[in-house]
Amino acid sequence: MDLPAGITKAGESITGEEWRILGHIYHAKHECDSSFSFETYDPAGTFVPPHIHTTQDEFIYVLEGRFDLYLDGQWTQAHPGDLVRMPKGVPHGYYNKTDKPSRALFWVSPAGKLKNLFEQLHDLTDPDEVVKRSAAHDVDFLPPDAVKGG
């Protein structure tokens, strides 16, 4: 898929879709063969547990709030203006441990199956089903007891 020229407005999706996944809200910002980006809205107390992208590098550009991150075996924080780099195969997860929402622009390269995964996860409430469907789309979650601290 080629990249179309244009602007995707803040808080909107290039496709008009909004995905709600376990408390988070995602808007697709662009999609082409080489990459896929999405804006996240993460209410206070939400998180995405540690996982690995087996075929994609992932990035987070923090727009608002604070991200507590598990990244390659270490705990760290990212703030507005920070860019987080998560190479493929490196365990990572993010948490909003504050009392305010956070927002960020995420993107992966190559695009892979992530957009299709979000379409399948929309409105699911069963975390086990999220893990199962994610694995079929090259995203492998770590076991809950695999990460200490944080």
What are the language-model segments listed below?
Residues E39-P43, I52-L71, S109:
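Short, conserved beta-strand element in jelly-roll/cupin
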Residues T46, F67, N116:
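Hydrophobic small-molecule pocket/channel-lining residues, especially in calycin-type beta-barrels
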Residues M1-E12, V147-G150:
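Basic/polar N-terminal segments that are highly enriched at the extreme N-terminus
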Residues K9, G73-P91:
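Short acidic-glycine-tyrosine-enriched beta hairpin
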Residues T15-P50, Q56:
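A short glycine-rich, His/Asp/Glu-containing loop-to-beta-strand
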Residues A28, S37-E39, F59, W75, ...:
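Conserved hydrophobic/aromatic beta-strand scaffold that supports enzyme active sites
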Residues D68, K88-L114:
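Ligand-binding loop in jelly-roll beta-barrel domains
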Residues K115-G150:
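Acidic/histidine-enriched, glycine/proline-rich intrinsically disordered or flexible terminal extensions
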